[in-house]
């Protein structure tokens, strides 16, 4: 579990935070049990974008996957600007050890890519470079979470497990990492860039998954201001189990 400052919760009713202290303690115990750090057996890895958040996000290289460890708490404020009813409060998550996020080291283009419409309405579809998971732009009812007013000023909110996650592209991270590095990685292994190409050029020719091939025939996704906002499914090979990508953290 990585250190984080209590100022992250300065916008919330601290009395409610104390009410869930028992839950947070339980999560901490689970974290300590699950946290057989990847660093104990695996070498550290460098993936573009993550290095700017090295104090709170660790990346390791396994046989088939990069493993991303974080506590799921971003440096920015949370839950401010939500227009719909939201009772959850963000708490530290045990994304470490066997619960680390898995990103394929060698992404493979799928023979039959899967759209996010009607699929992957549970769990994450990508991981942002600040260690926060990104869910489908559609909530578990199939509605656009942004248009429904469910998201805060940073494009995120909490799930029922008090896990903070985004539903749209966290382009605000470019104020930290710049525009040349990915802002996230889809769980099929392909990188996700901002609304422009890394060289600053206008993005053209996106497919229905919000991605395309570059001049070197490498595939990547882009953020957009309109749906699907982030990767609209998976151009690469993934396994779907009970409506979500497997493995999850």
For every predicted segment, state its role.
Residues 1-16, 20-31, 39:
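N-terminal secretory signal peptides
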Residues 41-130, 135-141:
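Solvent-exposed N-terminal domain segments of exported/luminal and surface proteins
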Residues 98-100, 122-124, 151, 161-165, ...:
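Extracellular structured ligand-interaction cores
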Residues 111, 134, 172-177, 192, ...:
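Short loop/beta submotifs within extracellular cysteine-rich repeat domains
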Residues 130, 160-173, 216-227:
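Extracellular/lumenal glycan-associated surfaces
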Residues 147, 151-152, 160-200:
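Short helix-loop boundary/capping segments
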Residues 149-156, 205-211:
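Short, recurring structural edge motifs at helix starts
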Residues 209-249:
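Long, compositionally biased interface segments
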